[in-house]
């Protein structure tokens, strides 16, 4: 494995970001680290969150010789990014809720942000709204339960649509034309969200913007892998280029199958003391 792109999240939500990056950089190697032992991040004390994330990510960067870290978690991005950047010499990219493009796209100037309670209440989020959506009426919806529903869907293939409709009732009532998905888990259930909200609501996430930023940074450092590498007449891209690491004692058969279907050949538990 060459120097990989390390994508980090609390759970499986970051797979949506990894998929966007792979569209732009299909020949790169990838590590996916998900700290599912401490999911959901939005309920952790900030200092506990920072200490655990820094320890996990820095250890795996050292182990894999990663060339860039993508924090594919909105909660971690608003809290942990400065500490990670202070402890790493490689680029660290975070997630920014797509407030600016949502405000630009909205015709009714009624937009919403669906995220975890932690992201909704953070000062950074309100700064984004003031800076980029001052001409819009912005509704904020914080819901941790949707994160666990996305995890459950990946693990079992099942989604409680009645419960989803109940959770989204305030969003429907707000009569928005654009809704920002402010958690990387939410694109994993985008079809179900769209079904409940209807075709009149455009859903926006940050995946494509993150991928663009990663490409820019790696291009600046001349680290783009331009073509498939061939060893013994076989391409090394694929199974050998995809590694997944998790922190919980065990993961479900459904999640294991999902990771294999995504192309991961190595699925390994790592431990943390934080």
From Swiss-Prot:
Molecular function, one GO term: glutamate racemase activity
Reaction catalysed by this enzyme: L-glutamate = D-glutamate
Enzyme Commission no: 5.1.1.3
Known pathway: Cell wall biogenesis; peptidoglycan biosynthesis
InterPro entries: Asp/Glu/hydantoin_racemase (IPR015942), Asp/Glu_race (IPR001920), Asp/Glu_racemase_AS_1 (IPR018187), Asp/Glu_racemase_AS_2 (IPR033134), Glu_race (IPR004391)
Organism classification: Bacteria, Pseudomonadati, Pseudomonadota, Gammaproteobacteria, Alteromonadales
Alphabetical list of PROSITE patterns matching this protein: ASP_GLU_RACEMASE_1, ASP_GLU_RACEMASE_2
Biological role: Provides the (R)-glutamate required for cell wall biosynthesis.
Catalytic residues of the enzyme: 73, 183
Keyword Cytoplasm: no
Name of protein: Glutamate racemase
HAMAP family registered for this protein in UniProt: Glu_racemase
One of the GO biological process terms: peptidoglycan biosynthetic process
Alphabetical keyword list: Cell shape, Cell wall biogenesis/degradation, Isomerase, Peptidoglycan synthesis
Secretion signal span: none
Annotated residues for binding of substrate: 9-10, 41-42, 74-75, 184-185
Family in the record: Belongs to the aspartate/glutamate racemases family.
Entry superkingdom: Bacteria
Taxonomic source organism: Shewanella baltica (strain OS155 / ATCC BAA-1091)
NCBIfam families: glut_race
Coiled coil: none
